[in-house]
Each structure stands twice: as C-alpha cells, then as structure tokens.
Swiss-Prot record:
It comes from Mycobacterium tuberculosis (strain ATCC 25618 / H37Rv). The gene is irtA. This is Mycobactin import ATP-binding/permease protein IrtA. Residues 610-843 form the ABC transporter domain. Belongs to the ABC transporter superfamily. Siderophore-Fe(3+) uptake transporter (SIUT) (TC 3.A.1.21) family. It is an enzyme of class 7 (translocase). Residues 1-292, 356-408, 454-519, 570-859 are cytoplasmic. Keywords: ATP-binding, Cell inner membrane, Cell membrane, FAD, Flavoprotein, Membrane, Nucleotide-binding, Translocase, Transmembrane, Transmembrane helix, Transport. It holds the Pfam family FAD_binding_9. Residues 15-122 form the FAD-binding FR-type domain.
Amino acid sequence: MARGLQGVMLRSFGARDHTATVIETISIAPHFVRVRMVSPTLFQDAEAEPAAWLRFWFPDPNGSNTEFQRAYTISEADPAAGRFAVDVVLHDPAGPASSWARTVKPGATIAVMSLMGSSRFDVPEEQPAGYLLIGDSASIPGMNGIIETVPNDVPIEMYLEQHDDNDTLIPLAKHPRLRVRWVMRRDEKSLAEAIENRDWSDWYAWATPEAAALKCVRVRLRDEFGFPKSEIHAQAYWNAGRAMGTHRATEPAATEPEVGAAPQPESAVPAPARGSWRAQAASRLLAPLKLPLVLSGVLAALVTLAQLAPFVLLVELSRLLVSGAGAHRLFTVGFAAVGLLGTGALLAAALTLWLHVIDARFARALRLRLLSKLSRLPLGWFTSRGSGSIKKLVTDDTLALHYLVTHAVPDAVAAVVAPVGVLVYLFVVDWRVALVLFGPVLVYLTITSSLTIQSGPRIVQAQRWAEKMNGEAGSYLEGQPVIRVFGAASSSFRRRLDEYIGFLVAWQRPLAGKKTLMDLATRPATFLWLIAATGTLLVATHRMDPVNLLPFMFLGTTFGARLLGIAYGLGGLRTGLLAARHLQVTLDETELAVREHPREPLDGEAPATVVFDHVTFGYRPGVPVIQDVSLTLRPGTVTALVGPSGSGKSTLATLLARFHDVERGAIRVGGQDIRSLAADELYTRVGFVLQEAQLVHGTAAENIALAVPDAPAEQVQVAAREAQIHDRVLRLPDGYDTVLGANSGLSGGERQRLTIARAILGDTPVLILDEATAFADPESEYLVQQALNRLTRDRTVLVIAHRLHTITRADQIVVLDHGRIVERGTHEELLAAGGRYCRLWDTGQGSRVAVAAAQDGTR
C-alpha cells in the first residue's frame, strides 16, 4: 500500500505499524460490531487505559491502492496475550472501516499503531463530585471504559445523542450511580440543550460527540455552567457529512462519520462560573496577590532588560575597540555598562526584597488561617488522610507557595524576556545569522514533541512500576530475617527489580539517540559552530562586516541555555499553583459548626445515656453508609456492634465521637445533641480508643495523661493498673519516663492497653472502643478484656469487634448490614433467633469461644 506524507511524519515521531490478526467478530447490536484481534507487538507501544484508542489503516473498499486511517477505542484488552478488541459502528452508506468490519473474516490482518494523540482517561487522585459524560454511539466504547473505572460511590450523568433507532440497543457498562439520557438529534444544539440546568460544581465533563454538537456543548458548559478548562475533556470523534482521518495515497477519502484518526481537541475557556470548582482554588487563594504578582512580572521584565543592557554595551565597546574609536568614546560606553550593571543588580535585589516582604505577610496570614482551619475540621478529615499528606500540605505546599510568590513569576518572566530580547538585538545586528539560530531551536522542539508522544504510554507504566517497587522494597526490608535464612533467591524483589530495569532499558534505549541530539542542539558549542560557519561565509563573500560577529559570539552562544530556562521557570510556576490549589481546597473544607443555642437536655435522660435518633450518614452525597439507625446506649452497659466488613460499624462509632456530622437525625449524649457541644466539651463526655493505637512522641506517663496533662503520677499509675499495662510499663528501660513514639517497642495489644489507660484517666462517661483486640495476641487479648470489664463500671461503652467471642457478655449486641440494624439482643437471644448473627457465629466467627470461656473462669 502507498505510504504518503502522513506515514513519513508518523514514522519521524517514532510511530511503527503493528500487524493485528482478526480472531472473531461479534454482532453486539444491529449496527454495532466488536472485532477481536491479536498482535504480539502492539502492547509494547500501546497502553490499555480507559478510553485509549488505536489508529488503523483500512483498505479502500473500491479496491484502490489507498489506505484510510481511522481511530477506534480499545473495548477489551489482554496485554499479556496481545489480545484486544474494538467496537465499530456500521454506517450506511459504508466507508472504509464499516465496509471492512462488515466483511472481515478470522485470519485477516490489518496495520495498527498506537502513537499520535490517543487520549485516555486517567483516574484522578482527588475524585470530582461526579462525571458528566456527553457523546453518541461512537463514544460508547470509551465511555464504557470510564464507567468501569469510576468508584461506585461517584455519580455519573450520561447524555447520548441518538442518530439511529438502534443506538439505544448498544450495551452500556453498569454502575450503581449511572443515569443515562438519550437525546434525539434535531440539530447540532439538541445535545447541549438537553443538559440539565443545575449546579455542576466540582464535576468533570468528558465530551466526545460529533464536532458540531461538541461546539454547542462546549459553549454551554463554559458560559452557563462555568466549567473551567481543566475540568473539561472536549474532543470531536467525528464530523457529520465529512470523513474523518487521513489516507496514505492521493485518492480522496470516502465520506463516513466514524471516529477520526486525529480527533479534534476542543478547548474550554474559563469564564465567570455559577458553580465553583476545586480547579479554580489556586486563583481564589492568590487573589490578594494578583496585583503584586502582575507588577512583579512587569518589573522583572524591566530588570531583565536592564541586566542585558551591560552585555550589549560590552559588545558595542568591543566593536569600538576594533574600529579604533577614541578614548573618550570608550570610557563613556564602559562607564555606562558598569553603571547599568550596578543598577540592574540593585533593582533585582530590591524586587526580591519587596517580594519577600509580601510573601512573609501573606505566609503569616495563610499559616494562621490554615492552623485555625485544621483546628475546626472534623477528626474524620485527619483519619481519612495519612500523616504524610498532611505534612506535605502544612510544610511542603507552603514552601512551594513561597517560591511561587517570591521567585516563580520573576524567573519565568526573565526566562522568556531574556532570549526574546537577545534575539531582537541580534536580528537588528544581522538578521541572516540570527535566523540560523532558530535551527537548533526547531530541532529541540521537534525532538521534545517526538519524545513526549513516544513516551506517552510508558509514563503511566512507569508510575505503576514506581508504586509497585516502593511496596516491594518495603516488603523486602521487612522480610530480611526470612530472606536471609532461606536465601535471597526466595525473594521476589530481585526478580521484580530485574523486570523494572528491563522495562526502563526497553523504554529509554530507543530514545537515547534523540536525547543525545536534543542535548547537542542546546549546547553553546552548537550555536558557536553555526555562528562561525555562517559568519565566515558572509564575511568571505563581503556581505557582512566582521565586527558584527562579536554580538553573536557574546550573546548567541547562550541562546540554548536561555531557552532551557523557560521550562524550569514555568515548571516552578506550575508547582506553586498546584500547592496553592491544595491549600485553598483545605481552607474550603466544611467545618464542624456548633449550634449557637444549645438545646436543653431532655428530661429523663441520664448524663451518660447515648441516643442515636434516626441517624443517616454518607461520605458522599446520595451514598448513605448509615441508614435510619435508632439505638439507645444505657449507662453501665456494653453495646457491641457487629456485622460483615463494610456494614458501617466503625462509621457509626465515629459519628458518636463527631468525626463527621450526620446528614439526617441526631445523636444525643445526656439529652443534648452533640452538634450543640463544643469539641472540648464533647470530649470530656466521650472518649475513644481507635483501631490503630496512637502514641505521641513523649514519655509513657505523658502518653497516658494526654487528656489530663496535670494528672499526678499516682492517678496515671492507677489508670495503667486498671488497663492491665502497669507491669509492662515498669519493665521499660526508664519505666514511666521512657520516651515512646512510632517505634515504641510495644506490641499491638500493649499499645491498645496504653490508650485504654489514657481513656480511663480521662474518666469520660461514654467510651468508644473500635476493634479493641484487633492487634492483640491471645494473652494481650485476655488482658484487654479484663480492662474492658473494669471500664463498664458506671460508663456507657460502645465496642466494635469482628471476633464475636470477645463480646458474648455484652449487654446489647447490634448487628449491622449495609448501614442498617438487622438484629439486636444478647448473645443467647441472637443465637436462638437463628438470624444473621447466628450465621456469623456458625461460619467461624466464634471459633475461639472455648478459649474465651476458659479465660472467663479465671476472672
């Protein structure tokens, strides 16, 4: 087949054809067929990500030598076996792809490549409020991949434009929160007008319909709903009435509305929004700095020009020396150069000092706001994040913001103004030599684009490899005793490391030549060689004065380095803006509000009585984790929450500690709604022991007395005795004065008992124990149970446990399933009922009851 300019360009960017062999074709709908293929080499270049597509070269149905290029989304993939499938809409009249898909037989082959422009859906670290998917039948394969990737608790709104009566027969992926709306096409505005008029704040839009419809959709998303550019993926998959894609010969392409080989990216321009997006958070945080940052950019441009001026004068001084100018003229130019050099340095220092003053004031106010905000956020906000992410927010992001305010804008402006200023000056001196300097720049930009395209699929793989190797390295270090005893060969880390190195070699080795050429293109020696060669030619032919080469020798050789500075300056700017976004998103988090007028306690409710009154709660709107739970906990009793994983046990307990606020209903302690209590007051009534025992850096005594810092040593030791941890503390190197921390040397059960001692000393009337024996060995578990028995005296205790034998003596056992109470009663009552609790017990949850009974006999 003929391969024209398009094929040459693709190959110059590193694209290569792979041969795919058809395995089978399956009719999914009357006009929708799935073609399954296999290619041993395709997935060396391609990455089977959701919504990623491949380029195919289809033969001309008229039998000519032309190949037509079309793009289709990967609907199935098994990279290890080299198998994949694409879905093709069969159009009438049929074009090259439809004709091929209708008639292709198993064993037929076709050329396919993965390079150049394939978009894919990347799951963000921070999920949006929901996904708005907009398209038509050609978009369904890609959207199905997205739907299968989106977590079940994230809503999806899907608008599909119907062009054919059979479009609705195309199967869609399943999702519990997916809502689909088919829109019959009347004109190009039909799809856009069908989008619900609502607040789409923090939603992400993926729009891939026909080109004319996309333009209308884009306008509505931008102008009426206020979607920012970063929250819209807009790409036309086909053009009504015009064939998409290219061909590899001179014959015209047949008209066919199919997915194009080069989908046309549409951009959305930010406009005043009715909604609010996290993507716009950085601009809100930096709004007070807008004028100073703009002014600093203008001043930085002037300072950069002032700093370039001495070099220009130095060049002119050299030209005067060569031409034999007088001493007075030389001294005048020399003193002017020195004066401008000093002036530029002083202006740069003054600008930096001014920006540091602005940054210091802004950073102080920001840190005060951030610390105040953190003190008012619900505890659930902290437990849902690792300490590393919070440290990054408070320390790293604020430092990145310092660079943004004080250095990023001046650096970025200087990186742009300096080469432009140099280039303008050199063009004034001699435009012919200056024009030659663009040669290495074009080479650099072309190679950079090629490397970006070739590395696209590998970048995702590299990120996954990095995450995998981090986990493997941690396991390798933790398993050193076993690895050394049984031999290093028994460790998978070495094999994984070899595979990782092989992946990096396979990725980077083919790019080595281009990277070397890119490095050479920006070196001063390259520019010097070009200047010397071009200048010599012009001087030898009497087209240029030799003295005019001096400016190029002084300034032209640094042109490449100045261009590299643009990337570094803009990189710092992007990092700072991302940090600003993280900080503002935190400042926008919902706080735990305290009602201004606390309600009086209800009559008849004891101070330690806890009431869950028709409580409903969900971590995301519309996805309840706790549903209409009503429950009363009496003083001096133990209430146990049991149920399968994900039933809502820990969530219900944390609601009592007000880690989050309920959506509906109320939780009362002593007759008062906990939302009417300040945090300090609430935690004098409710104490808790978390599933993972938390120790702070301090002595054992300080860890126990965390809630009562002024408690005397005698009270601390009494609490430790009641928690069955006193003897273990005495065995520590310095007893109660031993400094503990993350690596305290205490076992899981011992850490649990230490935190129980902390709760005992706090003497709260209500106590929450989340998985109190989760990390305990049998001996420690027995001691923890003894401590729990002591805690029930005159206290309301809520216990969560998966191991049912630990709560057989609870006064009340509540069985949860999917956030609802399905059973409640004592251990004996629930076993006799033969319901969910009985089934949990029979499946082995109570297998250790004999051990527990034996231990109970010794109490």
